[in-house]
Swiss-Prot record:
GO terms for molecular function: ATP binding; magnesium ion binding; tetrahydrofolylpolyglutamate synthase activity; UDP-N-acetylmuramoylalanyl-D-glutamate-2,6-diaminopimelate ligase activity. The lineage of its organism: Bacteria, Pseudomonadati, Campylobacterota, Epsilonproteobacteria, Campylobacterales. Meso-2,6-diaminopimelate binds at R358, D382, N383, P384, R385, G433, E437. InterPro entries: Folylpolyglutamate_synth_CS, Mur-like_cat_sf, Mur_ligase_C, Mur_ligase_C_dom_sf, Mur_ligase_cen, UDP-N-AcMur-Glu-dNH2Pim_ligase. The modification N6-carboxylysine is found at K204. Its cofactor is Mg(2+). GO terms for cellular component: cytoplasm. This is UDP-N-acetylmuramoyl-L-alanyl-D-glutamate--2,6-diaminopimelate ligase. Pathway: Cell wall biogenesis; peptidoglycan biosynthesis. It comes from the Bacteria. NCBIfam families: murE, PRK00139.1-4.
Length: 463
């Protein structure tokens, strides 16, 4: 990537930053126009950022022809050039709940009158305006810093971002000065990349090393942070933010207490949220705790702002009522378990698959989880990518017992229609895995596909 921005570093001026060796190679050939620079632009005018991904591509010629900076120095460069408008950076990591927690924090801070940027799975937003479309949960380091520059130019008070395990391991967040780091939970995901659950947990925990404010889930057994200054929130265990009583039948209703580090009760407040499930109660607590730590606003005022949050598209999204149809992004065992737990008082039908070319170890567990809770199960494709949909489905089935109400249909649209055709008025249909994604990846082709649109079209055709 290349960012065309004038920056100063060590008493020198540069017209751009890049972490792509191909940019420097093109400049050496007098072909700077390939990357939007002047054709004969000098390599001395482009600051090259070394990182974990590009270090093996840096040839001696590249090393000798341009100025280089380590990735962890980027934050200092940014602050030196834009320090008068530096926002408070809030990083949220965890297996599940990052997107919803980030969105709640963003919503509450906006309601409290702050200028806020939000970066994550759903894209890049500033003050309710989408700046960039969906991309990686945490983008490349240079794109991340480009987004920070935009937030600074817009005079944002806060920069809320999701932090993936890939980004932590690949050092895409190196050098960032976080005002607050938040943990939602640690279960299991991306074992195709991290190779073991122990390594995955280690990576997640590494985010909380060092100094700085931290807000952690007190009920999470796999957080190993020993920082005595850390804040905690919890449902089962008491923390700085705790639940005194709660109900989940019609959204979230409860009463919460905020305690400072001496654990004397300072504030209490009722809370209401248009969200379903215990997992969303955790997300809500994380968000409330974060806003309290960051702003010191009265707890009741934060709770009032929470009531205006309408949910996240594709996260426990109600697409149809009577019968009830929910679309959600849940694509891990734990994510599915939390959704099923939210509807365990209902008769559940579920449509789901698993992504191809990704962690295969979770597939049997997902199948077993579905069979534990649902009385109708429709196994289909998610984003098969270059894997055979049939082999993915077989992996899911390997974790299940033979059942009369287990149906296999690799075509996702047909599977959804099949489930809708047999859906009874007293059942809830959960369509899991893709959430608000509007595409399906089959082979190397990305085609338009939206679970929600399929459901709406089905019911529209029957009116």
């Amino acid at each position: 990537m290349i960012i065309k921005k004038n920056v100063s570093y060590k008493d020198r001026s540069f017209i751009a930053l890049t972490d792509d060796t191909r940019v420097i190679e093109s400049l050496l050939k007098g072909e700077g126009d390939k990357f939007g620079l002047q054709k004969d632009a000098d390599t001395d005018k482009v600051l090259f950022v070394k990182n974990k991904q590009n270090k093996n591509f840096i040839t001696p010629q590249i090393a000798q022809s341009c100025s280089m900076v380590e990735s962890y120095e980027l934050n200092d460069i940014l602050m030196a050039n834009f320090s008068h408008n530096s926002p408070n950076i809030v990083g949220i990591t965890g297996t599940n709940g990052k997107t919803t927690t980030a969105a709640i924090i963003y919503s509450i801070l906006l309601d409290l009158g702050f200028n806020v940027a939000l970066l994550g799975t759903r894209g890049f937003f500033i003050n309710e305006h989408r700046i960039k479309p969906k991309g990686l949960t945490t983008p490349s380091m240079l794109e991340l810093y480009e987004n920070l520059c935009i937030a600074m130019e817009q005079k944002c008070n806060f920069f809320i971002m999701e932090v993936s395990s890939h980004a932590i391991e690949q050092e895409r967040i190196a050098g960032l000065d976080f005002a607050l780091k938040i943990l939602t939970n640690i279960t299991s995901d991306h074992l195709d990349y991290h190779k073991s659950v122990e390594e995955y947990r280690r990576i997640k925990n590494s985010f909380f090393e060092g100094e700085g404010r931290k807000l952690l889930n007190a009920d999470e057994p796999y957080i190993y942070c020993t920082d005595k200054a850390a804040y905690f929130y919890g449902i089962e265990k008491k923390g700085n933010l705790s639940v005194d009583v709660y109900a989940l039948e019609n959204g979230i209703d409860g009463y919460i207490s905020w305690r400072e580090r001496d654990y004397k009760t300072n504030e209490q407040s009722a809370i209401q949220a248009h969200l379903y499930g215990k997992h969303n109660l955790y997300n809500t607590l994380a968000a409330i705790g974060a806003v309290k730590i960051l702003t010191q606003e009265p707890l009741e005022r934060i709770a009032e702002a929470l009531e205006h949050f309408g949910g996240v598209s594709g996260r426990m999204e109600v697409v149809h009522n009577m019968p009830l149809v929910i679309v959600d992004f849940a694509h891990t065992y734990d994510g599915m378990y939390q959704i099923f737990e939210s509807f365990r008082h209902c008769k559940i039908a579920v449509v789901f698959g698993a992504g191809g070319d990704r962690d295969k170890s979770k597939r049997p567990k997902m199948g077993a989880c579905a069979q534990q809770f649902a009385h109708k199960i429709y196994i289909t494709s998610d984003n098969p990518r270059t894997e055979s949909p049939k082999s993915i489905i077989e992996d899911i089935l390997s974790g299940m017992q033979d059942g009369e109400y287990v149906f296999v249909e690799a075509d996702r649209k047909k599977a959804i229609y099949m489930a809708l055709e047999s859906l009874e008025s007293d059942e809830v249909l959960l369509i899991l895995g893709k959430g608000d994604e509007d595409y399906q990846i089959i082979g190397n082709e990305k085609i338009y596909f939206d679970d929600r649109e399929v459901v709406r079209n089905y019911f529209a055709s029957r009116t």
